[in-house]
Design a protein with these regions (language model features):
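Membrane-proximal, glycine/serine-rich, low-complexity loop/turn segments characteristic
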Residues: 13, 20, 61, 77, ...
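Short, acidic Ser/Thr/Gly-rich low-complexity loop/linker segments typical of extracellular
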Residues: 47-63
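Surface-exposed loop/turn segments flanking beta-strands in extracellular/periplasmic regions
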Residues: 126, 302-331, 375-394, 441-456, ...
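A short, solvent-exposed loop/turn motif at the edges and junctions
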Residues: 48-51, 73, 77-89, 119
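Outer membrane beta-barrel strand-and-loop segments of large Gram-negative receptors
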Residues: 396, 532-534, 578-586, 683, ...
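Signature of Gram-negative outer-membrane beta-barrel scaffolds
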Residues: 522, 548-651, 835-842
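Short, ordered, surface-exposed loop/turn motifs in non-cytosolic proteins
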Residues: 32-47, 121-123
Length: 983
């Protein structure tokens, strides 16, 4: 009897399991284009049990699979924004393949949103897709205004972060848009044209073809446009004039302003009269698209990043390497504007085209030019604290910089046949920079006016030019069997710079009675050349339907020559008859080579992927500094592991673990003093070893399809062995260099140190608040870092604990009312390990927060109210510091023309005249407050015009565009940008 019962139970269990083992597969495509629809929701409802529902979202190519289905009859519904919902009855028996399901375009967006709130977000592997219709913005908003409302995405001063990582590139319908300039791309498209926004991890060109992730990818955003807006002309244009009564937007002057040595030459950073003209036009004709963007203003509006190949802003330059011989990574040269007030002019053109059968030949290119003239008056207060000597520095400065950039990016793809393809990337950039600056400061004891006294002065005038060219060529072959591939690529890069500078700076000799430093005048010429050559060979071999092996070899060579010829002159900087000063002149040659080889393994099944690589790398450094040879060899083993796991269609986790090395360069290793600044001497360390870094990133995303909620968690950790840190000695006495005695304020060198850590975690949660028709995004994070250094031959650890929180409430009511309310705050607690117990300055605590609101309201008969309020506060708990200001911009406007595509506005920028540019920095042994120039209150009038002409899908004729072939009507007219609100 027992055996019979057990047998019956087993049969029941098997029967139940079989009943739930059914699966349904299908491919969802656009009826007209036959392209796969990614991110569509497919829902099955059991007819025998209506409470039983299962759903999934379509992946690559529109494919979808739903598993765990009991055999029986189901009602199927397929939904996606911009398409009529598809319904059908299906019968599931075992594995059921529906084949191709076609969606018909043309449903009203609101109808779909009302039907299923789930259309906020969807997931497919490591891609999170946001449906634009679920985040309503004003009719004339651009893409940047749209993505700010999406959970997990933040935009701060033009820098875009998604899921805790910086976004390096923007794609439009899968094609690169304006190269690496994310800011320009986001300001070139109207939000109305966007169907969805996809955040994904973009693989390198090599990894994308072979399928073997090599760890050189980056975070990117793909903007998918509405299918009925891919044929037409659209954009926005604007023109405005303003007047500023009070043009003194500089920080307060210090008490030593009238010193004889400091002679200000920048009278005003801005002018009474303001102008702001610009716009963008997009011409989409099937496979061929042209976008043009332009900007001209003197109100500091810079909706682009410029390419700093000279390294003049402190955000880049200084070398081609971000790793031995591999050149800079994506976006590494792109920096945001400098401090101050700028007159700006820019123009950019983007082109995308495809030809041949199945678009076998593709071309993507962009050209961008920008010119800025930036003026700034600055004020700096710096406290040197324990473990540094208790000194206090006050410094005042001014600068004027003319900067010019040209950059050209081209990508060419040729699919030779089904097994072979060729791809090339060409980048050409030119930069010109003419900087002028001078700073005057007084260094005193712990309390201003007491103790020791030094005068610091630095004046500089120069001219720099740089050109950068790179060519990347990749040949890819499928060897018949699926997964068996060979990829060969090579890269050549060239960078040449030439800088001519005159400097006057203070030495340690001071005429204390007259409060005048003894100045040294130097004229220098600094040419620099770099060449980078690399080659890569990757072979992949499938070992099963789900797994693949690879073998990769990579070679990198970097040749660098840096020369500086400097002359000590008189006040006229005349070098006639002078010999170069040996202590200030130098010639550095460096040749670096790296060989890297290693196997890899990839497993992929469904939406789950694991990639693992191990590399052996051998590096060689051969250099010469001031006639001294430097030779080093380094051998390392590095690793890479990436896994992407989908628990179900709503829960995915991605883990990224890798190691990498940083080899010291010849300047780190040189056993020669740098005496170019006698107050701050430095020297290399020939005993330096390579640093070895371990890094881990984890991303978890959960999307609640039914309730439209999105939760994200990010965790990252970094540990560095043999960290290359600074060793600083203060007031080091009697340093004998070539018979000259130096007594610098600070002497520094490099040392290998252990104990560098950086941990960060961040969560974000976004959900709709239905009663008030809004979307609420909440986020919070914690960051802890510990950086080792040596101070007066003692080990010091600078630990910083940072907490941040953010709240954003965005309207989702209609295009006639668009508002966002935001708050974000950060609290930092920095400590120095050399400062014990309750000693003064044992810890440095400060808090900053910002509360802001933006409103665009279209009300009675097309009148508009546009406003922005921003409150900033900085609180220093350690030194009882409090700085706050409130900025308020208000504009009243009126919509014009039949379709309200025009708008006239009048208003005021910075109504309360409180704008400030303030920054607080905490480092190893110091705290610094800095102020820079800003634009104050001004009154303005502006005209905007939104260009919208869309034609028949698939039409090749300009006459088919709505409104383009009509007689009369309103011609294109300037307008479109939001009112002049300086960033």
């Amino acid at each position: 009897m027992k055996r019979l019962l057990i047998l019956v139970m087993m049969l029941c269990m098997v029967s139940s399991a079989m009943a739930q083992s059914g699966r349904l597969t299908a491919k969802i495509v656009d009826m007209e284009t036959k392209e796969g629809v990614i991110g569509a929701i497919v829902e099955l409802q059991s007819k025998s049990n209506p409470n039983l529902r299962k759903h999934n979202t379509t992946g690559a190519g529109g494919s979808v699979t739903i598993t765990g289905l009991a055999a029986g009859d189901y009602s199927m519904k397929v939904m996606f924004i911009g398409y009529t919902p598809y319904t059908a009855d299906v019968k599931v028996e075992g594995t059921t393949n529906l084949g191709v399901v076609e969606l018909t375009p043309g449903v009203a967006i609101e109808a779909v949103v009302k039907e299923v709130q789930a259309l906020r977000t969807s997931q497919n592997g490591d891609t999170v897709a946001y449906n634009a219709a679920a985040f309503k913005v004003a009719a004339d908003a651009d893409v940047e205004g749209l993505i700010k409302k999406m959970p997990g995405i933040t935009v701060t001063n033009g820098q875009v972060e998604a899921q805790g990582e910086q976004v390096k590139k923007i794609f439009v319908d899968g094609k690169e848009f304006f190269g690496e300039d994310v800011s320009t791309a986001l300001n070139s498209l109207p939000a109305q044209a966007v169907d969805r926004v996809e955040v994904f991890n973009k693989l390198s060109d090599n990894a994308e073809f072979s399928g073997m992730d090599d760890g050189e990818g980056y975070k990117a955003i793909n903007i998918v446009t509405h299918s009925n807006m891919r044929q037409g002309v659209f954009g926005k244009m604007y023109a405005g004039y303003g007047y500023q009564p009070d043009i003194d937007g500089s920080p307060a002057e210090l008490s030593f302003q009238n010193t004889n040595i400091y002679d200000p030459k920048v009278s005003n950073v801005t002018s009474h009269h303001k102008y702001n003209v610009g716009g963008n036009v997009n011409i989409f004709q099937g496979n061929h698209r042209v976008s043009v963007i332009g900007l001209l203003n003197n109100v500091n509006q810079q909706n682009f990043s410029f390419e700093d190949i000279l390294g003049v802003t402190g955000g880049g330059g200084g070398g081609m390497g971000g790793g031995m011989g591999r050149g800079r990574g994506v976006g590494q040269y792109m920096v945001r504007p400098q401090s101050g007030v700028a007159n700006v002019g820019s123009i950019g053109v983007q082109y995308t085209g495809a030809w041949g059968e199945k678009d076998a030949v593709k071309l993507n290119g962009s050209y961008f030019f920008n010119s800025t003239n930036t003026r700034n008056k600055s004020l700096l207060q710096k406290w040197y604290e324990a473990p540094s000597p208790d000194d206090y520095l006050e410094q005042e400065g001014e600068s004027e910089t003319h900067n010019m950039n040209h950059r050209l990016n081209l990508r060419f793809d040729w699919r030779i046949n089904k097994n072979m393809s060729l791809m090339s990337r060409t980048n050409l950039s030119f930069q010109g920079n003419n900087p002028y600056s001078q700073q005057y400061g007084e260094l005193t004891g712990e309390t201003p006016g007491e103790g020791k006294y030094e005068i610091l002065y630095n004046g500089s005038n120069g001219s720099s030019r740089a050109i950068r060219f790179s060519e990347f060529l990749q040949y890819r072959v499928n060897l018949g069997k699926v997964g068996r591939t060979i990829t060969v690529d090579g890269r050549y890069a060239l960078r040449n710079t030439l800088s001519s500078t005159t400097n006057s700076f203070s030495t340690l000799e001071t005429d204390y009675a007259a409060k005048l430093p003894i100045l040294r005048y130097v004229s220098s010429l600094a040419p620099q050349g770099e060449t980078d050559i690399s080659a890569n060979l990757t072979y992949t071999e499938p070992i099963s339907k789900s797994s693949q092996l690879s073998l990769q070899y990579r070679f990198d060579l970097e040749d660098q020559q840096i020369e500086k010829t400097a002359y000590i002159t008189g006040e006229d900087y005349n070098i006639t008859g002078l010999q170069p000063d040996a202590s200030l002149s130098s010639l550095t040659n460096s040749l670096s080579m790296e060989h890297r080889v290693g196997p890899g393994y990839r497993y992929a099944k469904g939406k789950n992927t694991v990639v693992a690589n191990v590399y052996y790398q051998h590096s060689i450094l051969d250099g010469m500094v001031k006639g001294k040879n430097i030779k080093r060899d380094y051998d390392h083993v590095t690793y890479f592991l990436m896994t992407n796991f989908a628990f179900n269609p709503q829960n995915t986790v991605r883990v990224f673990i890798n190691s990498y090395t940083h080899n010291p360069d010849v300047r780190n290793l040189q056993d020669i003093y740098d005496v170019s600044n006698a107050q701050y001497l430095s020297k290399g360390n020939p005993e330096l070893r390579s640093s070895y870094n371990h890094r881990m990133n984890l991303h978890y995303v959960r999307s609640n399809i039914e309730k439209g909620r999105t939760f994200m968690w990010m965790f990252s950790a970094q540990l560095t062995q043999d960290y290359i840190g600074q060793s600083i000695e203060y007031n080091k006495k009697d340093i004998n260099i070539d018979g000259n005695i130096y007594n610098p304020l600070q002497y520094s060198t490099y040392e290998n140190m252990d104990g560098y850590y950086n941990l960060r975690t961040h969560i974000s949660y976004g959900f709709p608040v239905s009663p008030i028709k809004c979307n609420l995004n909440l986020s919070a994070g914690v960051n802890w870092s510990r950086t080792p250094s040596m101070i007066d031959n003692q080990m010091n650890y600078t630990s910083n604990m940072g907490y941040d929180a953010r709240m954003s409430l965005g309207s989702n009511i209609s295009e006639n009312i668009d508002f966002t309310i935001e708050w974000n705050g950060t609290f930092n607690d920095a400590r120095q390990s050399l400062v014990k117990g309750n000693m003064r300055n044992a810890r440095n605590q400060y808090f900053s927060h910002t509360a802001s609101g933006q409103l665009k309201w279209v009300f009675w008969k097309g009148f508009t109210l546009t406003g922005a309020v921003n409150y900033n506060q900085y609180i220093g708990f350690t030194n009882n510091y409090n700085e706050d200001f409130l900025i308020c911009n208000v504009y009243l406007g009126k919509k014009l023309f039949k379709n309200q595509q025009g708008e006239i506005l009048v208003g005021v920028n910075d109504l309360l005249n409180q704008n400030k540019a303030f920054a607080r920095t905490v480092g190893s042994g110091y705290t610094q407050n800095a102020w820079n120039s800003v634009i104050g209150r001004y009154f303005t009038v502006q005209f905007n015009y939104n260009l919208r002409h869309f034609g028949k899908k698939g039409s090749k004729s300009i006459d088919d565009y709505d409104g383009m072939g009509q007689k009369g009507g309103m011609p294109p007219f300037p307008g479109g940008r939001p009112p002049m609100m300086p960033r």
